Amino acid sequence: MKLLLSFALLGLVACQEKCDSQNKYCFPNEVATWTGAVEYCLKNGWKLAVVNSEAKQMKIEGLAKNLPEFKNGKVELWIGASDQTKEGHFVWIANGQPIEYANWLPGKPDNKDGKEHCVHLWYEKAKKLNWGWNDVVCTSKRRFVCERKKK
């Protein structure tokens, strides 16, 4: 039991070490499916990020520039939006609210092959993709951004 608790605490500490204490964003050093990312954030007292304003988008972009992947020219991060319940109707998983602010890449969302229902932020220098949103297959694995829940 002590060992299990120690691992749980290590996971929480690792998440917090990557967080901005003022705005409370976290970039766990993990890769997961979209559902796995939702579960990871919830398990640690967070939520998969709700990017419902340009200010939040800019804050997350600024923080993500500190990730090692950014220096390599490519970052993909799950955020908490999906249209799994109703095709074409993207909502925030944390509160069920429809997306009002969005930063879709040109031509997105496109639900390629009828299988893309989860949203990620995508930065890729070589392709000139500058933090736009893209719909992708939910079972693909990538890093993610959690946001501390309001108390």
Curated annotation (Swiss-Prot):
Protein name (record): Salivary C-type lectin 2
Cofactors: Ca(2+)
Transmembrane annotation, as ranges: none
Triggers of expression: Blood feeding does not affect expression levels.
UniProt KW keywords: Disulfide bond, Lectin, Secreted, Signal
Gene Ontology terms for molecular function: carbohydrate binding
Family matches, as PROSITE patterns: C_TYPE_LECTIN_2 (PS50041), PROKAR_LIPOPROTEIN (PS51257)
Cysteines joined through disulfide linkages: C41-C146, C118-C138
Residues annotated as signal peptide: 1-15
Main location: secreted
